[in-house]
């Protein structure tokens, strides 16, 4: 598979042939489920000119159906382009293909999609991760050069780690959220999934920057990262020792070898500890579900999306539309969020969660005052099997090493470093100071080149 960097040099005719080739391959590999049905039958001319980039089904592309992989949004056609799509088109790229996802980005396996599950290209019995599992599977399976996803608590980095590609979540506010179907507004961030670190920098440069359409967009100077990539920069890296030690034995051993390689290549390694991750999980799922319960209140059958046909009055329209339209996991999170925001529980749960979030952010900032980057696992294990019976709580633990990065609003990247005995991917996670994506990508490129060599 050619890289983004190579494809940007293609002629118009070569790009048209590339899109036809990708579309045919996607149809042939339909069983992977990386794309939802509406892409496979789409007239390729509507994608426009430019290097093709696959798009998660919660990012608005004018004229395309946008469903967030949910029954309740079937038939909704996006009336405008998200800011990231506008930026893509302005920088020589074109949206190409709707990627499958967990419904409303709530999940870690891409098994809750209305369209059916996505398979992991490395092993069809394993989950691709989530919620951007379709975006990761498309890149890892050679069905896309690169893709856009969204990351609320690890939804770009975790599937990238499970599928074996690079997953990069920029700092909160660095990439506009205008046109992203919201899950948790204070945590959501659009990110990129690519074949390598340089492509991640190129695609990030194309979509990043201040946007007046997004009130949470960071109005600070943005300097392109790809032209300034430097894999030879020697960095001070803080290894989160308790997280590495708590990971599965194969993941732990692979990360310890990676740390030794970083030392051997001249990077300074120091060891730090973070809080027990149970505090991250508690704070995250209170804040995220609280915000989700309000964000998803707009899906009521009145303005857009699918309305229940089994209605006699206004109350039945609301109740039946939402009961029939939302999947089980989405309902669970709406109920949890409504509960923690309710009278009598707001102070006991939501306010405490916000205090915990501030404490988590301060701990990261304390470590990064003295270090360039943080190193830790992306996931505690490699990709698990679909038939593994996991309770909702066990599933939430899949994001145990990624959610705190969103709570702190920092940038993070997942880089493949090894394979386990079954050939499944193991990745390392690097984390940077807020808005210091250049250092993050430099460190990731250094790590990637070490592994390849």
UniProtKB/Swiss-Prot annotation:
<comment type="similarity">
    <text>Belongs to the amidase family. GatA subfamily.</text>
</comment>
<dbReference type="InterPro" id="IPR000120">
    <property type="entry name" value="Amidase"/>
</dbReference>
<feature type="active site" description="Charge relay system">
    <location>
        <position position="56"/>
    </location>
</feature>
<feature type="active site" description="Charge relay system">
    <location>
        <position position="131"/>
    </location>
</feature>
<protein>
    <recommendedName>
        <fullName>Glutamyl-tRNA(Gln) amidotransferase subunit A</fullName>
        <ecNumber>6.3.5.7</ecNumber>
    </recommendedName>
</protein>
<keyword id="KW-0436">Ligase</keyword>
<dbReference type="GO" id="GO:0006412">
    <property type="term" value="P:translation"/>
</dbReference>
<dbReference type="InterPro" id="IPR020556">
    <property type="entry name" value="Amidase_CS"/>
</dbReference>
<keyword id="KW-0547">Nucleotide-binding</keyword>
<dbReference type="InterPro" id="IPR004412">
    <property type="entry name" value="GatA"/>
</dbReference>
<dbReference type="GO" id="GO:0030956">
    <property type="term" value="C:glutamyl-tRNA(Gln) amidotransferase complex"/>
</dbReference>
<feature type="active site" description="Acyl-ester intermediate">
    <location>
        <position position="155"/>
    </location>
</feature>
<comment type="function">
    <text>Allows the formation of correctly charged Gln-tRNA(Gln) through the transamidation of misacylated Glu-tRNA(Gln) in organisms which lack glutaminyl-tRNA synthetase. The reaction takes place in the presence of glutamine and ATP through an activated gamma-phospho-Glu-tRNA(Gln).</text>
</comment>
<dbReference type="GO" id="GO:0050567">
    <property type="term" value="F:glutaminyl-tRNA synthase (glutamine-hydrolyzing) activity"/>
</dbReference>
<dbReference type="GO" id="GO:0005524">
    <property type="term" value="F:ATP binding"/>
</dbReference>
<dbReference type="InterPro" id="IPR036928">
    <property type="entry name" value="AS_sf"/>
</dbReference>
<keyword id="KW-0648">Protein biosynthesis</keyword>
<keyword id="KW-0067">ATP-binding</keyword>
<comment type="subunit">
    <text>Heterotrimer of A, B and C subunits.</text>
</comment>
<dbReference type="Pfam" id="PF01425">
    <property type="entry name" value="Amidase"/>
</dbReference>
<dbReference type="InterPro" id="IPR023631">
    <property type="entry name" value="Amidase_dom"/>
</dbReference>
């Amino acid at each position: 598979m050619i890289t983004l960097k190579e494809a940007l040099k293609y002629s118009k005719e070569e790009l048209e042939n590339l899109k036809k080739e990708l579309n045919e391959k996607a149809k042939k590999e339909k069983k992977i489920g990386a794309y939802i049905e509406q892409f496979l039958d789409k007239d390729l001319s509507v994608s426009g000119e430019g290097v093709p980039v696959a798009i998660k089904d919660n990012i608005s592309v004018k004229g395309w159906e946008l469903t967030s992989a949910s029954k309740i949004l079937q038939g909704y056609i996006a009336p405008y382009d998200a800011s990231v799509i506008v930026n893509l088109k302005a920088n020589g790229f074109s949206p190409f293909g709707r990627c499958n996802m967990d419904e409303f980005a709530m999940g870690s396996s891409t098994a809750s999609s209305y369209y059916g599950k996505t398979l992991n290209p490395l092993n069809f019995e394993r989950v691709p991760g989530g919620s951007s599992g379709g975006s990761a599977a498309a890149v890892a399976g050679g069905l896309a050069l690169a893709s856009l996803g969204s990351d609320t608590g690890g939804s770009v980095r975790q599937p990238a780690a499970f599928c074996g590609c690079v997953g990069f979540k920029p700092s909160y506010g660095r990439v506009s959220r205008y046109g992203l179907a919201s899950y948790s507004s204070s945590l959501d961030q659009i990110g990129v999934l690519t074949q390598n670190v340089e492509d991640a920098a190129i695609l990030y440069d194309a979509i990043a920057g201040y946007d007046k359409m997004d009130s949470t967009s960071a109005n600070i100077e943005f300097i392109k990262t790809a032209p300034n990539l430097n894999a030879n920069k020697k960095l001070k890296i803080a290894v989160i020792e308790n997280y590495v030690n708590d990971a599965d034995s194969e993941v732990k051993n692979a990360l310890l070898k990676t740390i030794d390689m970083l030392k051997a290549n001249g990077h300074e390694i120091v060891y730090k500890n973070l809080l027990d991750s149970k505090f991250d999980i508690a704070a995250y799922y209170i804040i995220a579900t609280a915000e989700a319960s309000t964000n998803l209140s707009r899906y009521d059958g009145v303005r857009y999306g699918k309305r229940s046909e089994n209605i006699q009055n206004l109350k039945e329209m609301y109740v039946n539309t939402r009961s029939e339209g939302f999947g089980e996991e989405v309902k669970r999170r709406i109920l949890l969020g409504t509960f923690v925001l309710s009278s009598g529980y707001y102070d006991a749960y939501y306010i405490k969660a916000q205090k915990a979030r501030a404490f988590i952010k301060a701990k990261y900032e304390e470590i990064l005052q003295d270090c360039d980057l943080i190193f830790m696992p992306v996931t505690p294990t490699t990709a698990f099997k679909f038939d593994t019976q996991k309770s909702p709580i066990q599933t939430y633990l899949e994001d145990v090493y990624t959610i705190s990065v969103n709570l702190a609003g920092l940038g993070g990247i997942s880089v493949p470093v090894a394979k386990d005995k079954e050939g499944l991917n193991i990745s390392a996670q690097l984390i940077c100071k807020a808005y210091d994506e250049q250092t993050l990508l430099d460190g990731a490129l250094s790590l990637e080149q070490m592994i390849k060599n």
